[in-house]
Regions:
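Active-site-proximal beta-strand/loop segments in catalytic clefts of secreted hydrolases
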Residues: 1-2, 27-30, 98, 121-125
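Extracellular ligand-binding/catalytic regions of CAZymes and related secreted enzymes
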Residues: 105, 113-168
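Catalytic beta-strand/loop cores that center a nucleophilic Ser/Cys/Thr
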Residues: 45-120
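A glycine-rich, often tryptophan-bearing local segment used as a flexible ligand/cofactor-contacting loop or short
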Residues: 4-69
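Secondary-structure transition/capping residues
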Residues: 25, 47, 76, 151-155
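Soluble or luminal CAZymes and related metallo-dependent hydrolases
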Residues: 6-10, 101, 135, 139
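Mature, folded catalytic cores of secreted/periplasmic enzymes
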Residues: 10-14, 70, 74-78, 138, ...
């Protein structure tokens, strides 16, 4: 299904689920998916070009998402995504991609929206065997664990506070 073909009702449900506490992981071209754009509130546009060598640097070794990785890992062939990436400033940037053609990209970005956690991970072009790389698999596994809900609500409300702060 093409990004634009996702019904708005589905986007509404995904957004509400994240705001209520569901974790969400967006891979590669999901940066242009309707749910990601809705959750980011921007176009999520970026620069790109055909496959080149990428070195992915761990810029936050304390993050649970980067546990078990070295200083960097390499992807022999990956679609280049380059800045400017039109997203809000991440709450936490954990991975930075550098390409042999000189571009850099915010490759692993963490966000909090409402009660939910979001992780965007850039690698994964369909014409490249990226998901067979052990470090890429580890990032995704770690991200799934990181995104597990810590707190969930059943509905999104804005209740009136019925009790006074203090008695007179």
């Amino acid at each position: 299904m093409k990004h634009g073909d996702v019904p708005d009702e589905v986007v509404d449900r995904v957004q509400a689920s994240v705001l209520k506490g569901m974790g969400m992981i967006f891979l590669h071209s999901a940066h242009h998916s309707k749910p990601f754009k809705r959750l980011m509130g921007t176009t999520c546009n970026l620069g790109w070009r055909d496959e080149v060598f990428e070195r992915v640097w761990v810029v936050d070794p304390a993050s649970p998402i980067t546990q078990g990785l070295g200083k960097y890992f390499e992807i022999p062939e990956e679609e280049m995504y380059g800045e400017r990436f039109d997203i809000p400033e991440p709450d936490r940037l954990v991975l930075l991609g550098w390409y042999e053609t000189g571009e850099v990209f915010r490759t692993g970005c963490c966000f909090k929206r409402g009660n939910g956690k979001i992780f965007y991970f850039q690698p994964g072009h369909e014409s490249c065997p990226t998901y067979h790389i052990p470090e890429v698999q580890l990032v995704i596994k770690n991200a799934v664990r990181w995104a597990v809900p810590e707190y969930r609500v059943s509905e999104l409300t804005c209740p009136m506070v019925e009790h006074p702060v203090r008695e007179k």
